[in-house]
Each structure stands twice: as structure tokens, then as C-alpha cells.
């Protein structure tokens, strides 16, 4: 079962992973009232469809004030997005996730999945975040690190250190990385997921 990004963020928060503040909107009524929970002046408006490639199809927009935010939400609702994963018919935008924007200095890719061959959990990490990971795997396989861990009650710190090796993090960033990786590990096991991915 695929879930929407806003649902995945709720699960990540439930398991202690740091995430940006955001809200999901299912219609365009009383938008200003709904947006009051958001604090920053910069926002990311994200169409919620079950397909990758939303950004290239116009389904992810950065806006810098509440007026433009309301306008962008109204324009995006009901729009049909066509991406490399939707087919020609595309997918209609029926819900939108609005998130407080973060200053991006670096983008990373991190996922964990069940490796059936070894009966272990495989963590895949890359410094090439924000991109199509399949393309990175094909064009720059040296930019991807895979580390397999035993299925246990919790992940060992020595494993986490190996997983975050490519990221070159400072002490504070490592604290957040530990929380995120521990959350991914627990979500994969407790939610019986086949893949948990952050890109």
C-alpha cells in the first residue's frame, strides 16, 4: 500500500523523527483560516498523488508569502499532473500538503527496505538527494552506499555511523540523523513496510 507524503510525515513524527511543520488541505474553502498554523514566510506547496516526478510536472512549488500561497493552492487543486510514473492520463490533485520551507544547503537520500536475499534490512544512503535515485544508481553507482543490518529490536549505533558515512555531518546534524534512522528502522519493522524512503 502506498501512502501520501503527509501521511508518511505523521508516521515519522510519531516515531520521533524531526520533520518540518505542515498541514494537509482537502479543499479550497477557508484557506486563510487553515493556514494560520504555519509560521514562516516561505512555504512549499506539494500535490499529493501516488507518483514520483511531481516537481517536474508542476506539483511542487515554493512560495514566499501567504497571498501567493493561497493563489498557488487554488491553482494546483484539481490539476492533472502527468509524470513519468502516472502514464499519459496523469493523476488529479485532490489533496495538497503545505509545509514550512527549510533552507537547503545539502540534499541527501536515505531509505531502508527488506533485503529478501540476506533476510536483513538494507539501508541505502546517498549524497545525491532530491534526484531520481534510480538514475543516480545507473549513472553514478559510486554515490550510493548500501549497508545491511540484522533484524532486531533496535538498530546499533555502529550501524548508524556506517549508514551516515557519506553525509559528513557535524555533531548536531548527527543527533537528528540518529533520530531519523532509528525512526525509519522502527517504522519498517512495526508497520510491516517493504520500503521507507526520504529523498
Locations of regions flagged by a protein language model:
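A conserved helix-loop-beta module that forms one wall/lid of the active-site cleft
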Residues: 1-41
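Electropositive phosphate-/nucleotide-binding environments in soluble metabolic enzymes
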Residues: 2-6, 25-28, 63-70, 104, ...
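ATP-grasp fold ATP-binding core
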Residues: 5-8, 12, 39-54, 83-103, ...
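Gly-rich Lys/Arg/Thr-decorated short loops/hinges at beta-loop-alpha junctions or inter-strand turns
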Residues: 13-14, 54-55, 142-145, 155-165
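Catalytic core of tubulin tyrosine ligase-like
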Residues: 19, 66-86, 163
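Glycine-rich phosphate-binding loop of ATP-grasp-fold ATP-dependent ligases
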Residues: 20-22, 45-72, 109, 132-133
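Hydrophobic alpha-helical hairpins/lids featuring a short glycine-rich hinge
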Residues: 83-148
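Glycine-rich, mobile lid/loop segments that gate access to catalytic sites or pores
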Residues: 148-198
Amino acid at each position: 500500500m502506498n501512502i501520501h507524503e503527509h501521511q508518511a510525515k505523521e508516521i515519522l513524527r510519531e516515531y520521533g523523527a524531526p520533520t518540518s511543520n505542515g498541514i494537509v488541505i482537502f479543499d479550497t474553502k477557508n484557506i486563510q483560516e487553515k493556514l494560520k498554523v504555519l509560521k514562516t514566510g516561505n512555504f512549499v506547496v506539494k500535490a499529493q498523488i501516488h507518483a514520483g516526478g511531481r516537481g517536474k510536472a508542476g506539483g511542487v512549488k515554493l512560495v514566499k508569502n501567504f497571498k501567493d500561497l493561497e493563489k498557488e493552492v487554488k491553482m494546483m487543486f484539481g490539476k492533472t499532473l502527468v509524470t513519468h510514473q502516472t502514464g499519459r492520463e496523469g493523476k488529479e490533485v485532490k489533496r495538497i500538503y503545505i509545509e514550512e520551507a527549510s533552507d537547503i544547503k545539502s540534499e541527501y537520500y536515505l531509505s531502508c527496505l527488506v533485503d529478501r536475499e540476506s533476510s536483513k534490512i538494507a539501508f541505502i544512503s546517498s549524497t545525491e538527494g532530491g534526484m531520481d535515485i534510480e538514475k543516480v544508481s545507473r549513472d553514478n553507482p559510486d554515490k550510493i552506499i548500501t549497508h545491511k543490518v540484522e533484524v532486531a529490536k533496535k538498530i546499533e549505533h555502529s550501524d548508524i555511523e556506517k549508514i551516515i558515512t557519506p553525509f559528513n555531518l557535524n555533531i548536531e546534524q548527527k543527533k537528528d540523523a540518529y533520530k531519523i534512522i532509528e525512526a525509519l528502522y522502527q517504522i519498517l519493522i512495526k508497520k510491516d513496510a517493504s520500503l521507507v524512503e526520504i529523498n
